[in-house]
Amino acid sequence: MRNPVISSQSSLLSRFAALCLFSSFVIPHSSFAVKPLLLPEVLASVQNQYPPYLAALIEQDIANGRARQALGAFDLNLNAGGSFNPAGYYDGQTGYATLEQPLPFWGGNVYGGYRMSSGFLPNYNKDRTGVDGEAILGFRIPLLRDGTIDRRRASLFQARLDQKLADPFILRQHLDFIRAATIGYYGWLAAGQRLGLSEELLRIAKDRDSAIAEQVKRGASAPIVQVDNKRLVVSRQIAVVQALRRFQATAIELSLFHRSSADDQPIVSERGRLPGAFPAHPEPDANQIVADIAKAAIFRPELRRIELTIEKLRIDQRLAKNNLLPNIDIGVQANQGNGSKDIEPTEIEAKIEFKMPLQRREAKGRLETAEAQIERLENDRKFARDRIAADVRDAYSAMIAAHDQLKQTQLNVDLSRQLERAESERLKQGATDLLALQIREQATFDAKVLHVEAQAEYFRAQGNYRAATAADAPASLLR
């Protein structure tokens, strides 16, 4: 059988441990001063330590790698080879080594090298050289197709546009992460203030409990009044636990954005870092809306991304039109022999080649695709301008409404406090009962909570407005 004394002590110890754990969250430590956590510190952490943003920055490195890869089409090429006749009337051997350089203009290339033959080869064999071999120098130039543009240059041009496209992608991520961090920060601040209000409401009920107990002892109040106040204390303790959980959840969410500069680990901000109040909330300037819409149209990444994508498609369009043309290539090659005089020491050869697919379906299909995609993106660009203007107007409207709500909730707090003080005086005079005062206290608490939420909503709306106007865009990502 379990010892009731030990059981009672264990229960007391467990309650004491739970109370200590609860107090560590509810009661801020005052043994040392802690610097309040302000929004700029969180935003700086996002730009320097937030992993998704750091991952977005790598997009520029990826684009740089693709541009370098496209440049590889213009690398200097070393070609070498040889041949021999293991059987037959002729037993000659030939070998060659050349360097070929593609040109970055007009689709041509130049080449030069050396070749040599030995053994017995017929005079008509073009691979036959003198004893000491011969030097080779030549070039090839397209006259129509692949002149103004070819696949190599198209890939390079598009890779360079991809480098520029990385900036709108990074900027979009930057604006989204800054907005999310801002909303998370003010959600954390609002939850902390709501927790403080819940604790204040609990303290009022606890302070009144001893006074009611004294009144019951003197016979001035019925015992049921004390029971009712104890019930009120318990219900308000439950509200504190709920508010504490909400604060912990917002602190954990904020820690994803707020990280240690030493090891990049998330920082779960304690109550001691809560600022004393929300920042000032000035009324939005109605004269700025037109200028901000124009600014957003310039700096928002959506339009820039569409414009650069259209440029890439125009390169595809040019390439498709190029592929409709026939191949007419000309080339000149000069050979300078050394040594034996039995063959002509200097030889110059000119070539011309014509080639064209008769149906040209591949080029026509590519052209149709590029033109259709350009037309689609032109419509997207027009709508993007409208969407940006609508985003700015909607965010501004939300900010105006939040500011108006702030004024109304502050008035609501003032009136609720006035009614609560009047009801408290009436209770002292015996003109009302405890229930009426509890209702007034709850109304004041609800009014204060509404005011806290209104302040958080104002700064959330402000964060959305700044994102809509690209106000927090880094200069390095703007064109």
What are these regions (language model features)?
Residues 457-479:
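Gram-negative outer-membrane assembly/targeting C-terminal domains
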Residues 32-94, 139-154, 158-160, 168, ...:
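Bacterial Sec-pathway N-terminal export signals of envelope proteins
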Residues 419-453, 459:
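C-terminal structured "cap/appendage" subdomains that terminate the fold
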